[in-house]
Every structure is written in C-alpha cells, then in structure tokens.
Amino acid sequence: MPETYALFDTTEGKFKAKLYADKAPKTVENFVTLANGTKTGKPFYDGLVFHRVIPNFMIQGGCPEGSGRGGPGYMFADEFHPSLKHDKVGLLSMANSGPNTNGSQFFITVAETSWLDRKHAIFGEIVEGYDIVQKIANSPRDSSDRPKKEVKINSVAIEQV
C-alpha cells in the first residue's frame, strides 16, 4: 500500500504530513478528496487561513469562512483507531463541534493533548517542517486566538509514494 503525504505550502513556509490511511481511511479519504478537489470541483484548502492559533496547544485551519464555523456542506462520523493518541506534537487531527461532526476543519498539535483522545480523530502527523507549524502557533494573535497577520494556506498537494 503506498504511503500518502500532504504537502502544505503556507505564507509562513512549507511542511509535510504523513497521512494514516491504514488507521483512519475514511478521514484520510475525506481530507485527500477535499485537498485535490475531487469532492468540490476545486482544491478546497487552497487560499484558506489558519483562523485559530494557540501556543502550546495547536493551530487550526480548514474553515472556508475563516471563522471556525464553516465546513464543506456535510459532516461525517468520528474514526478512532486504538493506537492513535494525542500524546505528542505534530499530530494532524479533525476539528469538530461534537461527536460525528467532522467536515473540513483540522488542527495540528504543538503539545501533548491527551484530553482530546476519542473526541478528535487523528489522521496524520507532521514529518517535515515542524518548525513552520511552531512558528505559526507562536504568531501574534488577537483575543479570539486569530493571527493578527493572516496565515494563509496557499495549497495542499497530495503525494503518494
């Protein structure tokens, strides 16, 4: 089975995530089809922003409104693998508003966040460019944790090797 990677190009630099297609197949399929545009007719994440950044916690993106309230127009069920825990930095996980409300929003941890286990589906981890993720997390932000200077996702390319 080929390994799947997501290559993030942002206004702050590039980073790469390995996607866990073997442990979270539905979640990875959703992310990949949004990223490459097969679900929406155009690459969904291109041009969106990281709308929430919290040092020592996470960075969050994937909202088409840039507010944290938007999504792709559908929701799907949680997918938890018993071996995946929020026990390290650099994990790629689905943001949601409760059980089975996953859509397009995701976050990347910059701390151990074990209280999120079995609440947010982990579907990958950063394998290159974690310093860029950390830089985004440490961006100056307003009282709503929104970066004062917009941090844009220029593109998310999917690579299979």
Predicted segments with their positions:
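Cyclophilin-like peptidyl-prolyl cis-trans isomerases
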Residues: 1-161
